Amino acid sequence: MLCLGLMSGTSADGVDAVLARFQGAPDRPEWQLLSHHHSPYPAALRDELVRIGQGEARPAAALLDLAEAVTEHQALAARGADPDQRASLIGCHGQTLWHRPPSSDKRGASWQLLLAPLLAQLLARPVVHDFRATDLALGGQGAPLVPRADAALIGPGDGWRGVLNLGGIANLTLIPPRWGPQKQESVLGWDCGPANSLIDLAMEQFSDGQQLFDRDGAMAAAGRCDDGMIQRWLREPYFQLSPPKSTGRECFGQEDLRRRLQELESVERADAVATLTGFTAAVVAQDLDRLRADRSIHLLELLVAGGGCRNPVLMSELQRRCRGLAVRASDQIGLAAEAREALVFALLAWWHHRGHPGNAPAITGATREACLGVRVAPA
């Protein structure tokens, strides 16, 4: 079956669209990535999404206009990846505006901006969307949804295999080995903390909006990392939580950056970016250290996807801090780093079509597994 996956993450840089073919057993399908297209958001649209994602209020009319603009851009990206309309089903994540994990006094909720009936009409094909809602209704975090899909797409290796996505947020998947005493362990996954979100915001601030990310890690490479401050930050509450846990720009956005820059006081801009880059790597390394200590899980390799894998300084920091671990881009095993998350939502749409569960209670904390998403057909 040909499916189209559409994904825009917390970085809000645009929409990734992939056309993929799936067949066979849902848990280990035969799959082929046929095309990938990235459609950047216009600057004004991206800026508005980032501001709202950090808590800025907007009138209802403005949110409606924004939903329409996001939906139309999803359709634009879809046409770029599938100009001949070969896909028979579309899986669309939408644009997260706010994610609220469950707490002791409030159920979890998550808002992905999308007018799904409009998208189905624009593309003249059924759309599966709202993938997080069912897991949240079952008491889960609603995130991350990628780990179960990672296990299906990548499969086990000779030892524990990690897949790290470095988008706005760093999220981690751990896939048990194909043999040995731990082969029956569950797939694990959680949101580690910020990946590119703070680095990107700092670059935009320092360049007066001229640079939206640290291209090739050039700014970080010119600076010096403050490891003392990083160790202090690692003691913050979120980084002490045990999985399941999830987060987003609502926690690691402009206000969080402002506080961290104040704590760094009068350091040079390059030093600040170097420290934020090292912080991203240190958050991941700390989680992996705890995993070894608490559960005797030792990764054999760490495959890195998302825009952050194109930052050589960040990759070098990961290699330095994750001692003894082979760190490499997911491209090296045939999984295109920038296409991975869109491919996941193509798979989730196919799973919905097959009636196959898409969440994993061990990862999200939901009371049970369930088929995810809501299907909308064109009129």
UniProtKB/Swiss-Prot annotation:
Pathway: Amino-sugar metabolism; 1,6-anhydro-N-acetylmuramate degradation; Cell wall biogenesis; peptidoglycan recycling. One of its GO terms (molecular function) is phosphotransferase activity, alcohol group as acceptor. Its EC number is 2.7.1.170. GO terms for biological process: 1,6-anhydro-N-acetyl-beta-muramic acid catabolic process; amino sugar metabolic process; peptidoglycan turnover. ATP binds at residues 9-16. Catalyzes the specific phosphorylation of 1,6-anhydro-N-acetylmuramic acid (anhMurNAc) with the simultaneous cleavage of the 1,6-anhydro ring, generating MurNAc-6-P. Is required for the utilization of anhMurNAc either imported from the medium or derived from its own cell wall murein, and thus plays a role in cell wall recycling. HAMAP family: AnhMurNAc_kinase. This is Anhydro-N-acetylmuramic acid kinase. It comes from Parasynechococcus marenigrum (strain WH8102). The gene is anmK.
